[in-house]
């Protein structure tokens, strides 16, 4: 699973996921299913945000990569992926500027068009149950919830899906492709079932025991299927800015 994640996702997303796990004392090399889930969630958050801007009249518009619209304001502020202190700083700044109610839990995005925080969910389980769990945890009508599944289903607060159909279809297609690629490598069942994942982990650890001290040969080749899987949606200029913003070390 770890090799699949590193091949499948944008390097910046992998780096952010590793950083988030280490912040909570988790090891991406051991908890590989969680590693994959965090990368998937991060990618959906970025895809949700990318190409969506607000023009000078306050209207939401879609701008594809390469268009000369650098002065447009991004519609969504990305909160997910930042370290907790920085994330709360961003949330507090938004609340102070807009007057919106401060959430009890860190949301994933802020929508400047609708003036609301957004909680993004990506589930391997039954979507209605997952939505109810999210809503029960957040306990706030001010935070908008939008859930996607790997089967192409989605569910949102008051059936308000925020994005246009094409943008949502891009997210659903990406999730379905990830599922198919996992399945073709025999990874999907353990990704869906925690019990199966634990069994697979024990099996992997047992296989590693006899050669723990041996050097590991790593292949850096990417299969043709993974080349098509590599996300092409990220705006290169924004990627660089996000990397600088999200990954910079805090000053001591």
Swiss-Prot record:
Biological-process GO terms, alphabetical: viral RNA genome replication; viral translational frameshifting
Marked site positions, Important for efficient shutoff activity: 202-203, 206
Record-level Gene Ontology MF annotations: RNA binding
Subcellular location field: Host cytoplasm; Host nucleus
Keywords assigned: Decay of host mRNAs by virus, Eukaryotic host gene expression shutoff by virus, Host cytoplasm, Host gene expression shutoff by virus, Host mRNA suppression by virus, Host nucleus, Host-virus interaction
Site positions per UniProt: Important for efficient shutoff activity and nuclear localization: 195, 198-199
Active site: 80, 108
Family under the similarity heading: Belongs to the influenza viruses PA-X family.
Free-text domain note: The probable endonuclease active site in the N-terminus and the basic amino acid cluster in the C-terminus are important for the shutoff activity. The C-terminus acts as a nuclear localization signal. The C-terminus is recruited to host protein complexes involved in nuclear Pol II RNA processing.
Task performed by this protein: Plays a major role in the shutoff of the host protein expression by cleaving mRNAs probably via an endonuclease activity. This host shutoff allows the virus to escape from the host antiviral response. Hijacks host RNA splicing machinery to selectively target host RNAs containing introns for destruction. This may explain the preferential degradation of RNAs that have undergone co- or post-transcriptional processing.
Name assigned to this protein: Protein PA-X
Source organism per UniProt: Influenza A virus (strain A/Chicken/Pennsylvania/1/1983 H5N2)
Gene: PA
């Amino acid at each position: 699973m770890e090799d699949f994640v590193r091949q499948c996702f944008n390097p910046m997303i992998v780096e952010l996921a590793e950083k988030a796990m280490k912040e909570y004392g988790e090891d991406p090399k051991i908890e590989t299913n969680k590693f994959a889930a965090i990368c998937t969630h991060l990618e959906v958050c970025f895809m949700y945000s990318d190409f969506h801007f607000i023009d000078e009249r306050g209207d939401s518009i879609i701008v594809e990569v390469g268009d000369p619209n650098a002065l447009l304001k991004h519609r969504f502020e990305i909160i997910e992926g930042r370290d907790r202190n920085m994330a709360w700083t961003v949330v507090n700044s938004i609340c102070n500027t807009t007057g919106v109610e401060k959430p009890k839990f860190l949301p994933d995005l802020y929508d400047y068009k609708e003036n609301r925080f957004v909680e993004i969910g990506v589930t391997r389980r039954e979507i209605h149950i997952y939505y109810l769990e999210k809503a029960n945890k957040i306990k706030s009508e001010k935070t908008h919830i939008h859930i996607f599944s790997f089967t192409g289903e989605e569910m949102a607060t008051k059936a308000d899906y925020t994005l246009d159909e094409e943008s949502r279809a891009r997210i659903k297609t990406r999730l379905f492709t990830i599922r198919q690629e996992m399945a073709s490598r025999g990874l999907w069942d353990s990704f869906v079932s925690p019990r199966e994942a634990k069994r697979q982990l024990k099996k992997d650890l047992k296989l590693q025991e006899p050669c723990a001290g041996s050097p590991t040969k790593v292949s850096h080749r990417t299969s043709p299927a993974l080349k098509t899987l590599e996300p092409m949606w990220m705006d290169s200029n924004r990627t660089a800015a996000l990397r600088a913003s999200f990954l910079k070390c805090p000053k001591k």
